[in-house]
């Protein structure tokens, strides 16, 4: 990612994701105890965590993102420990957190299977994964458009896949569906309308 893109991305995220605040708040109401947030980013989730959360382990390799996110966390009064790493290789012990959170991150990781396996490793038995992500559109024509623009989209948006199909990755993982819904967010470009909001539990 270029320096310019890395510095602009926090503000792009804010503009795109703020309208989803109520949906994110509802999802994060299930967080508790020790939480790992994959891709803490600009800290948009910081003020949405309930009082049941003791601390947040913020996995965030981007210094410009962390500069914004850490300030928001401090303002929200959330205890946050930064981990400068990528989701495919988390420098955390097994069974070290109660809940993993991934909002608008799995679209950009290089190896979704490895990331989901790592999250399952670090989450304690009975723990949860809270997921909010844009996914492949069910309409074949739109899915084809998503795939066609993926190379250019990845360049413009830090490796993001506009229509990554998450089902094969989740089915191959150790996560079982607890609650799952697919919704369209129409304020976003049509190629990223379809989103999945879900809770999974370690199998």
Predicted segments, located by residue:
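C-terminal alpha-helical "lid/dimerization" subdomain adjacent to the S-adenosyl-L-methionine
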Residues: 5-18, 132-192
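Conserved alpha-helix/loop element of class I SAM-dependent methyltransferases that forms part
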Residues: 14-34, 44-48
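Class I SAM-dependent methyltransferase SAM/SAH-binding core
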Residues: 36-38, 42-89
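A short acidic, Gly/Pro-enriched loop at the edge of an enzyme's catalytic core
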Residues: 88-99
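A short SAM/SAH-binding and catalytic strip from SAM-dependent methyltransferases
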Residues: 98-111
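A short glycine-rich, Lys/Arg-flanked "PGG" loop and its adjoining helix->strand segment in the class I
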Residues: 113-125
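C-terminal lobe and adjacent flexible extensions of AdoMet/dcAdoMet transferase-like proteins
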Residues: 195-203
